[in-house]
C-alpha cells in the first residue's frame, strides 16, 4: 500500500470524442487566470548513471505559468530531465530552483500509466492526491470539484477496472490537480491513447492549465502535440538543449494550420537530421 501511494505521489478546436466529453472545451480564452505557477531555473544540470552521461549541462529558465514542451529522440534525456525537476531523482551536478516560496506538494507529475489504486473507487483515487489533507473535512468536496473539472462527476463511484483508457487518464489528471500544484510535469501522459481521445485530452490539459495558472512541463514524442500546446518547445539531443522554439501563436490554436505546420516541420527537420548524424557515427 505504501509503495503504491509513493508512486502515485510522484504525480500538471475540434470537439472531443465520445470517450472524452470534456465540459467547457469552448472556454473564453480572453479570461485566462493570472499565473500562480512557480518559476523554474536549472543551472549546469548534469545526470550520469555510472559511466553513461545522460544530461550534459542543462541551463534553462522557465517563467511562472509558462507551458513548455520537451521533444527529442528516445534516449536523449527528456524523461530523466523531468524526473530531476519533479524530485524523483537527484542530479549528479548542478541545481534546480523554484523561486523562494515553494511548499511541499507544489510540484506534481502525471505519467503515461494512470497508476490508479484498483481497490479504490474513482473519488477515493482522486482524494489520494491530497496527501496529508486526505482526512480533512473538505477532502471529498475538493475531489468532487476537480472531477467536475475533468468531466467525470458521473464516474465518482465507479471502479477503475470499468473505465476506458481516456477516463483513467482523466482520473489521474484529477488526482494530480486536486492539491492545486504550482508546477505540473507530464511524462508522455497521452502516449497510449487513441488519436481522437488524445486530441480531446490535449484540449483538456490546455484548458486546466489556462484555468489554474500552473507552470506546465510536458515531455512528448509527438511534435504536433508539442507545438499545439506549448509557449516554448525545447529540443533535446544527446543530453543537451539544442533548440528553444518560441510558439508565438494565439490560443486556442487550430490544428493543421499553416503556422503550426511550419513550426512542426522546423522541429522535425532538426530531429531527423540529428538521427541521420547519429546513424553515421
From Swiss-Prot:
SUPFAM superfamilies: P-loop containing nucleoside triphosphate hydrolases. The keyword Repressor does not apply. One of its GO terms (cellular component) is plasma membrane. Keywords: ATP-binding, Cell inner membrane, Cell membrane, Membrane, Nucleotide-binding, Translocase, Transport. Residues 40-263 form the ABC transporter domain. GO terms for molecular function: ATP binding; ATP hydrolysis activity. It is an enzyme of class 7 (translocase). Its main location: membrane. ATP binds at residues 72-79. It holds the Pfam family ABC_tran. It is a peripheral membrane protein. Belongs to the ABC transporter superfamily. Aliphatic sulfonates importer (TC 3.A.1.17.2) family. Part of the ABC transporter complex SsuABC involved in aliphatic sulfonates import. Responsible for energy coupling to the transport system. The complex is composed of two ATP-binding proteins (SsuB), two transmembrane proteins (SsuC) and a solute-binding protein (SsuA). This is Aliphatic sulfonates import ATP-binding protein SsuB. It comes from Rhodopseudomonas palustris (strain BisA53). The lineage of its organism: Bacteria, Pseudomonadati, Pseudomonadota, Alphaproteobacteria, Hyphomicrobiales.
Amino acid at each position: 500500500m505504501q509503495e503504491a501511494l509513493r508512486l502515485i505521489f510522484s504525480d500538471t478546436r475540434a470537439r472531443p470524442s465520445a470517450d472524452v466529453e470534456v465540459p467547457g472545451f469552448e472556454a473564453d480564452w480572453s479570461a485566462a487566470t493570472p499565473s500562480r505557477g512557480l518559476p523554474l531555473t536549472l543551472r549546469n544540470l548534469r545526470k550520469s548513471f555510472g559511466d553513461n552521461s545522460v544530461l550534459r549541462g542543462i541551463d534553462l529558465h522557465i517563467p511562472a505559468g509558462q507551458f513548455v514542451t520537451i521533444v527529442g529522440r528516445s534516449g536523449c534525456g527528456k524523461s530523466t530531465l523531468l524526473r530531476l525537476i519533479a524530485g524523483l531523482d537527484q542530479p549528479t551536478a548542478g541545481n534546480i530552483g523554484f523561486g523562494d516560496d515553494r511548499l511541499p506538494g507544489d510540484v506534481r507529475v502525471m505519467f503515461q500509466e494512470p497508476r490508479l489504486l484498483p481497490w479504490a473507487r474513482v473519488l477515493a483515487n482522486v482524494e489520494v492526491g491530497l496527501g496529508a489533507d486526505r482526512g480533512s473535512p473538505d477532502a471529498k468536496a475538493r475531489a468532487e470539484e476537480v472531477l467536475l473539472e475533468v468531466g467525470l462527476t458521473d464516474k465518482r463511484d465507479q471502479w477503475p477496472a470499468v473505465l476506458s483508457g481516456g477516463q483513467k487518464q482523466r482520473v489521474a489528471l484529477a488526482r494530480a490537480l486536486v492539491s492545486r500544484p504550482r508546477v505540473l510535469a507530464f511524462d508522455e501522459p497521452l502516449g497510449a491513447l487513441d488519436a481522437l481521445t488524445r486530441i480531446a485530452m490535449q484540449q483538456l490539459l490546455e484548458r486546466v492549465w489556462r484555468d489554474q495558472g500552473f507552470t506546465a512541463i510536458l515531455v512528448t514524442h509527438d511534435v504536433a502535440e508539442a507545438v499545439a500546446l506549448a509557449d516554448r518547445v525545447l529540443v533535446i539531443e544527446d543530453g543537451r538543449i539544442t533548440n528553444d522554439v518560441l510558439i508565438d501563436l494565439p490560443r486556442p490554436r487550430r490544428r493543421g494550420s499553416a503556422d503550426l505546420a511550419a513550426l512542426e516541420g522546423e522541429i522535425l527537420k532538426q530531429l531527423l537530421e540529428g538521427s541521420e548524424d547519429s546513424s553515421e557515427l
